[in-house]
Amino acid sequence: MAIAHLATEYVFSDFLLKEPTEPKFKGLRLELAVDKMVTCIAVGLPLLLISLAFAQEISIGTQISCFSPSSFSWRQAAFVDSYCWAAVQQKSSLQSESGNLPLWLHKFFPYILLLFAILLYLPALFWRFSAAPHLCSDLKFIMEELDKVYNRAIKAAKSARDLDLRDGPGPPGVTENVGQSLWEISESHFKYPIVEQYLKTKKNSSHLIMKYISCRLVTFVVILLACIYLSYYFSLSSLSDEFLCSIKSGVLKNDSTIPDRFQCKLIAVGIFQLLSLINLIVYALLIPVVVYTFFIPFRQKTDILKVYEILPTFDVLHFKSEGYNDLSLYNLFLEENISELKSYKCLKVLENIKSNGQGIDPMLLLTNLGMIKMDIIDGKIPTSLQTKGEDQGSQRVEFKDLDLSSEAAANNGEKNSRQRLLNPSC
């Protein structure tokens, strides 16, 4: 019965979906903070203004008010308002006091803002689907390798310390140069760090930086066009809120009881003028920020990798490049995800101690630090592995006991056979 119950549990466990393992770098930022700020403001502000415009339309009702004769019923007056609102984009039915002004801009003002919001979101969408997956995999590889370089340094420093302790105390001249002996570590621990070689290849690559510059260029052009449109709309909004409308068409064309023209006024123009001014001011302030994003990769910052100069054979001088390339962009994203890089925190502590201390060898300090756990679940051993290890340990103990008993039985058998050979009476 117990065997059947156990077999049933195994069968049902095979059908259960396994929970996905938790990734090590689960909070990687694949967009720079300044770019994310520009996208949120440039896209979110028009959407907010559109919601305010539609809220005003819902609260007021109609967007136009036409002066109808007192002889008109309320249905006839509503027909005049609806007809003139629908004929706003038709120049033949309208006549403005200021000339032929594009009155349709007032009618489609919220939708034009929505169009700008969509256009400004396209660069972020393009970056997310074309560049972010490749960037994410590269950042995970680089950060894992940086942690591995740090772990190898600790392992090498501890092995050198154990070697010195095993050899025993030496003469005074040797003890004075203990720091130097720790630096002279076997090249097998640090020979050709793969992360250093991989980062050097990014100096000659420009695929990622071209995508980044293209996205920033599209954002700049769209914001500039939006500023031109908003300034133009703000300048003409106060001149074109009133116009004359004719409804004589079809069966009403020869009706003498209907006036030739109706005086109409767009009610929402004042609100739209205020919204366009707010949007224009914010976009004008965003233009210098967008221009600044063009020059961010040109800074060539290597502050994060400079900390790793404490480790042997890790040379940051080879990472400094000129002009725009992928390496400058990778340095920026490493700086953006510095909170996920555990080895950087430890090496930063060593750098501060080394700068404040007097003649302290960082390799000696490495022996006091712990290694970074590179497990997927960050050092947490699954319970299944623990129970499996315990079962294997118990099996080893049982096998060991069996081996000992078999060896004892064999020894007893050999002893008895020797006694029979020595004693002829047996």
Curated annotation (Swiss-Prot):
UniProt site positions, description: Cleavage: 375-378
Residues bearing PTM Phosphotyrosine: 198
The keyword Magnesium is assigned to this record: no
Catalysed reactions, as listed in the record: chloride(in) = chloride(out); iodide(out) = iodide(in); Ca(2+)(in) = Ca(2+)(out); ATP(in) = ATP(out)
GO biological process: ATP transport; calcium ion transport; cell-cell signaling; monoatomic anion transmembrane transport; positive regulation of interleukin-1 alpha production; positive regulation of interleukin-1 beta production; positive regulation of macrophage cytokine production; response to ATP
Any one annotated GO CC term: bleb
UniProt keyword Flavoprotein present: no
Residues linked to a glycan: 254
Annotated positions of the S-nitrosocysteine modification: 40, 346
TM spans (from-to): 41-61, 107-127, 217-237, 278-298
Disulfide bridge positions per record: 66-264, 84-245
Coiled coil stretches, renumbered: none
Compartment(s) of residence: Cell membrane; Endoplasmic reticulum membrane
Keywords of the record: Calcium, Calcium channel, Calcium transport, Cell membrane, Disulfide bond, Endoplasmic reticulum, Glycoprotein, Ion channel, Ion transport, Membrane, Phosphoprotein, S-nitrosylation, Transmembrane, Transmembrane helix, Transport
InterPro entries to which the protein is assigned, alphabetical: Innexin, Pannexin
Family the entry assigns: Belongs to the pannexin family.
PANTHER family, A to Z: PANNEXIN (PTHR15759), PANNEXIN-1 (PTHR15759:SF5)
Function: Ion channel involved in a variety of physiological functions such as blood pressure regulation, apoptotic cell clearance and oogenesis. Forms anion-selective channels with relatively low conductance and an order of permeabilities: nitrate>iodide>chlroride>>aspartate=glutamate=gluconate. Can release ATP upon activation through phosphorylation or cleavage at C-terminus. May play a role as a Ca(2+)-leak channel to regulate ER Ca(2+) homeostasis.
Name of the featured protein: Pannexin-1
Species in which this protein is naturally found: Mus musculus (Mouse)
Biological classification of the source: Eukaryota, Metazoa, Chordata, Craniata, Vertebrata
The encoding gene: Panx1
